[in-house]
Structures are given as C-alpha cells and as structure tokens.
C-alpha cells in the first residue's frame, strides 16, 4: 500500500517537473510568402529593339517582380492592332507622330506611358559617299507609312535636296514637295524592304532597326543622319483603359535605366539618344 502511494507521488512529481520544463515560447510564425509576380505582355519590333527591351524586361523582373513577355513583330501596323485587341498590355516601338496618325485613321484609344529612345533615321547608299555626289534625277527610296514618309522628307529638306510646302507638317507626302532642284525620283517602299533596295537606288532613307539588321549604323554608314532634336522620340504606349496600371509604369522605370541605355548603344553603335 505504501509502495503504491509512493509510486503515485513520484508520478505526480515527474509530471509537474515536465510541465515546468515545457517551452512557453510561441511557435515561430511562418515565413511570409513572396507576392506573386505581376505579368505584362509587351509588343516590340523584331531585331535590335527586341534585344534592348529584353534587358528592360530583366530589370523589371529583378527590381519590380514583373514577368514581362515580349511579342516580336515585323511590320509597323501590327503592334497597335494587337494592343487594341487586348493581346498586349503595352508596346514599345513607335513615336508620337506615328501614334497620332494611327489614332486618327484607325480610331485606336491609346495612351503614352513613357519615353524610350530617339532612333535617328539616316540615308544610306552603296553608290555615293557624300550628298554632293548626287546626280540629277537620282532615285531615293523612303518609307511608305505616313509618319516615317514625312520624317524622311523633312530630312531631305534639311539637306537642301527638296523644299516642302509646310515643313512643320510631320505628315508631308510627295505631293507637298514644291521644289526639287535635283529632280529626285522618290520611291515609297515598305520600311522592312528598304535595305534590300540599296542595289537598285542611289540612296535610301532607312529606320535604324531595319538598318542594323543589315549591319548598317547611322554613325558609321549614314550619308546624312537625323539629329537629336528630332520630335520622333519612341514611346511606351498602352490602351486608354490600362494607362494607370502600376506594372506598366514600373516597366517604364525599368526601361529608363543606364543598363538599358548601354545595351542600346551596343546594338545601335551611337545611333540612339536617351528620350528621358
């Protein structure tokens, strides 16, 4: 009987001792989960511009936790159509004169979110090295879309090769040429085809993205080049209905960085100017 009592007492003491040793610290809280990455689909022109934008996409992921999917296009008419249809959240390929014309002609509801670069257009030739070598009746190929056509004509006027009815009109066409002292034959051609025309014309005015694809750079190969005061700064554009999307604004911040600028210099070899 005594042994039973002693055993019971020992058990009670052990239980109390164990209770005293119990860790009263609260359980560690679970580590907070990383917020889900935001997602953006951005349209760009294929080639060097796409490669530069890939760096912006990398920075957007690292700094702002945005997964950026780039969709590449080969024709200027495609990215705004895809944006309007909702296939893209934004695009980065056009300047304001081009966007304004698209809005006017196609009724797109677009908004500017930020600037990227000025990619100066330039005149290239396999037949002459200086504009002074141009013969009477020389043939020049220019882009055929409205804004880049006007841009090319303004560049020709700045060189004294033609005179336009209204130089302030960014959408001048061939019928607005009121003086043409060298009787230039102006051929309007789809932009992506212009580099291939160099064997058939005296010179061509080519956008930088198409020129670079053929190993041409404005700084090294251009007969004459658009300067930094051009109004044709490229843009990041959204639809009106998503222009306040914070992810798009953060993507612009990622684009407007020194790392992206240095990548652009590498691909365009001096043929690029910061737009911010």
Swiss-Prot record:
Residue positions bearing lipid (S-diacylglycerol cysteine): 21
Keywords tagged on the record: Amino-acid transport, Cell outer membrane, Lipoprotein, Membrane, Palmitate, Signal, Transport
Residues of the signal peptide: 1-20
Pfam families xref list: Lipoprotein_9
Membrane topology: Lipid-anchor
Keyword Zinc in annotation: no
GO cellular component terms attached to this protein's record: cell outer membrane
Lipidation, N-palmitoyl cysteine type: 21
Domain of life: Bacteria
InterPro entries membership: Lipoprotein_NlpA
UniProt keyword Mitochondrion present: no
Subcellular location, record wording: Cell outer membrane
PROSITE patterns in alphabetical order: PROKAR_LIPOPROTEIN (PS51257)
Entry's Gene Ontology BP terms: amino acid transport
CDD domains: PBP2_lipoprotein_IlpA_like (cd13598)
Similarity field: Belongs to the NlpA lipoprotein family.
Function: This protein is a component of a D-methionine permease, a binding protein-dependent, ATP-driven transport system.
Protein's name in the database: Probable D-methionine-binding lipoprotein MetQ
Native source species: Pasteurella multocida (strain Pm70)
Gene name of the encoded protein: metQ
